[in-house]
């Protein structure tokens, strides 16, 4: 027979340690998340269906953008009133950078919001886009590095 301490240890659960939110509270939370971000699969689907009701913005450096970027994306490493003057305010902006460890898209989306644009961040950025087989454009295309470096 096992001791009570061993039984308690076996029954402990990190998943169940904190109770789940009530369904309506959880629904509001998840609906809120979807207002701020979109994922690679949703963007791929829309692009494959020809939906162009949004603008894709890459916040990485011009050099990195030239090497590899999502088709149709525009490069805006600096977002301010001057650089977005030609952007249509009636289109949502989908903003990305390298990946989950890069906050360039978060900063870019925030700056776009400050300038009156609606923006969502692409979860996982270019890294997840490429890992999920998304098409890329650029001088190196799929041969481009998968991460940021000091030279680009």
What is the predicted function of each stretch?
Residues 50-56, 71-72, 92, 118:
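Short active-site oxyanion
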Residues 74-82:
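Glycine-rich, highly charged phosphate/nucleotide-binding loops
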Residues 70-72, 108-111, 135-136:
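Short, glycine/charged-enriched secondary-structure capping and boundary segments
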Residues 74, 92, 136-140:
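Short, hinge-like loop/turn segments at secondary-structure boundaries
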Residues 1-64, 138-152:
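Flexible, polar/low-complexity N-terminal or interdomain linker segments that lie immediately upstream
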Residues 117-152:
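A generic hydrophobic-segment detector
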Residues 81-131:
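Catalytic cysteine-centered active loop of the rhodanese-like fold, especially the PTP/DSP P-loop
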